[in-house]
Every structure is written in structure tokens, then in C-alpha cells.
């Protein structure tokens, strides 16, 4: 018997919202369990976005799942001595390359969606998709910059997109994500300062800045 996603949608969105909030709240605390819960959440959002016609966002959830497994491993073993990964900041070169990549990828993905799908918001969908991937990559590396990218590049634009698509609960979720991301930004910056006060600078990976 075929499974009708439209029948399950009233249950999928609340479940995705709850697990999504749990994921970000645990990420703020740098809890490793945030990754498996996040994988479950992204799988639920994948189903939800397919039904809503947000195709780039659907692909994004699949990438999130792959990055989730990578982030899970990297947080455990990506530290300077193969141990827990510390919070750091990206180098200036990394920031410039990411910014250029975001612009080029947004134009390419937006054009692709405009030509090949029935998406009514191809370029906004593409921009939030590319920025989401960027933020998630930064998160897997425990770069502090992941939080402002989530807030200004992803969550704020998504509020408008999801309201336009009739996903009110998911739009409201972005407000919760923004509040949690601000908390994460503050907490991770504090974690960096505490680490620098305790450990020698030699313990910081080469090419990585440490903010006070």
C-alpha cells in the first residue's frame, strides 16, 4: 500500500518542529546527541518540503543528513589531538572563499530551479539553501561564524518563505531558532574565551583565529 504523505503531514510538521528545537538547543550546549536528533529532524523536514514544493530545501535536508553524520564524527574526533573538537573561528581566507562560493552557487542554483522546476521562489529558495549548507558546514567544524549565518542568512529569510508557502508552524519555528542561535553565539564565544584562558595557544589548530 502506498503511503500518502498528505495524510501524515499534520503529524510530520509538529514532530519536525519539536526535534528541530531540541537539535538547536542541544547544539548550543555542544552536546553530541544533537547530531542524531538532528538527522531525524531533517528527515521529517525533507518529507514536509517535498509536499510543499520546496525542492531545493528538500535536497538540502538530504545534504543535512550526510553532514549530520560527518559532524557527529568530527565533533568527537576532530580536535587537535584527535579528541573533542573545540570552538574556533574561521580564517579570513576561509571567510572570503565561502562568501564568493555563496554568491556563485546561489546564482547557479536559482537559475536551475527557475528553469527546471515549478518553484515560485527559485532565487530566495536557492539563497537560503546555499546559506544553510554553508552554515551547516561551519557548524560541523564548530566555527563561531555558523551562528550569525544561521540567523541572518537562513532563519530570517525563511520566515517570509514559509509564510508564503503556508507553513505557519515552520515559520514560527524560525523565531525560536533565532533566539536559540543568539544564545548559541554567546555561549560558544564564552567557551572560546574559557578555553584560551586554560590551554596554551599551541593547542589551537594552525590557521584558526581565537576570539577573546
What are these regions (language model features)?
Residues 1-29, 47, 78-80, 88-212:
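Polytopic alpha-helical membrane-helix bundles and their juxtamembrane interface segments
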Amino acid at each position: 500500500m502506498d503511503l500518502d504523505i498528505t495524510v501524515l503531514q499534520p503529524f510530520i510538521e509538529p514532530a519536525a518542529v519539536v526535534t528541530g528545537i531540541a537539535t538547536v538547543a542541544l547544539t548550543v550546549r555542544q552536546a553530541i546527541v544533537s547530531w542524531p536528533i538532528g538527522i531525524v529532524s531533517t528527515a521529517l523536514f525533507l518529507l514536509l518540503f517535498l509536499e510543499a514544493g520546496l525542492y531545493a530545501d528538500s535536497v538540502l535536508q538530504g545534504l543535512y543528513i550526510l553532514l549530520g553524520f560527518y559532524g557527529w564524527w568530527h565533533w568527537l574526533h576532530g580536535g587537535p589531538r584527535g579528541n573533542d573538537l573545540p570552538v574556533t573561528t574561521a580564517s579570513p581566507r576561509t571567510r572570503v572563499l565561502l562568501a564568493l562560493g555563496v554568491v556563485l552557487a546561489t546564482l547557479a542554483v536559482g537559475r536551475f530551479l527557475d528553469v527546471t522546476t515549478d518553484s515560485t521562489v527559485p532565487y530566495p529558495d536557492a539563497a537560503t539553501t546555499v546559506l544553510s549548507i554553508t552554515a551547516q558546514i561551519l557548524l560541523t567544524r564548530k566555527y563561531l561564524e555558523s551562528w550569525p549565518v544561521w540567523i541572518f542568512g537562513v532563519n530570517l529569510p525563511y520566515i517570509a518563505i514559509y509564510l508564503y508557502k503556508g507553513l505557519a508552524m515552520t515559520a514560527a519555528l524560525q523565531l525560536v531558532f533565532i533566539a536559540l542561535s543568539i544564545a548559541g553565539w554567546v555561549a560558544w564565544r564564552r567557551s572560546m574565551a574559557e578555553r584560551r584562558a586554560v590551554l596554551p595557544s599551541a593547542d589551537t589548530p594552525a590557521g584558526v583565529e581565537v576570539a577573546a
